[in-house]
């Protein structure tokens, strides 16, 4: 089945034509120099997107979840202590993975709709006089709630506590779409995937290791085989992989990085912010609220929109797909049935966003919600017209 409509789930995202063509390539010998000429530019492109000159990048045939496993198994040992916040579906899942690997996780229960509590982290880290906490986990952009956390504040908490713990960041739904500064924020491991900001099909876990994280690899005793970065680094030095690589996706990653860097990282972030702000203007016009509780927490890659009490938000998602062939995101975990999500990341324009807003209006009106047709569209149009005019004036 092939839809001609844009997709508005928060990943996998719309795939531009040049990325589809790059992925759909003839088979090559992945043990030949040809593959090396494809691999190393992709690694360097990712470093630029991460805003790092120091990190080593690893590409595993997996998803963001495999990236998480890469992070913990390559740096930690059974019983090691980890600090995290439980403020959404994906922080819950990362904590669960740590516990399944035999790690000792201290977690701060945080309401869904709030960000990572850097102040509480600072208190806990300051109290850890023996520096038993080895790693701090933080989700930069919680996809289930549409909440952006302040990673720089988490780094400041570590520094204020004079604590040597490593900082691991889940940037699966932020990197490539929202400002991410691996070196400046002192991120030791950054995790993302191919299917969101990089605008590719699922299948690549993209992980950056700082020099400090690389040092931890040598003392880590958690079992790892497939995700062992030592084997991967050995393969890279020989222009190859320790096993068969996803050649087409790596070729696509080259095309993706070229596109992102040609647009300019700051322009990419500004475009995402402008489109997201238009969606938020529509939500206000509908009289609805976001799951994120304060403007500084609003995500520029996904909006989780609360529906009236007693209404099943899943009906919006199913009706949109069945009636208008448009895909929105369902609510997850604690907010399942309470929110629907509009993804606005990757390959997206103002006009594409307007089609999603208009469809959401039709769906909600069909289902009897008190939504005035055209209200959200008009609010978003006004925002896009004003911001486009301002950008053109600035460019002139």
From Swiss-Prot:
The keyword Secreted does not apply. Disruption phenotype: Abolishes growth on glycolate or glyoxylate, but the deletion mutant strain is still able to grow on acetate, succinate or glucose with comparable growth rates as for the wild type. It is an enzyme of class 2 (transferase). The keyword Transferase applies. The modification N6-(pyridoxal phosphate)lysine is found at residue 196. One of its GO terms (molecular function) is alanine-glyoxylate transaminase activity. Its cofactor is pyridoxal 5'-phosphate. Catalyzes the transamination of glyoxylate into glycine using L-aspartate as the preferred amino group donor. Is essential for the growth of P.denitrificans in the presence of glycolate and glyoxylate since it functions in glyoxylate assimilation via the beta-hydroxyaspartate cycle (BHAC). Can catalyze the reverse reaction in vitro, and also use L-serine and L-glutamate as amino group donor, but with much less efficiency than L-aspartate. Belongs to the class-V pyridoxal-phosphate-dependent aminotransferase family. This is L-aspartate--glyoxylate aminotransferase. It comes from Paracoccus denitrificans (strain Pd 1222).
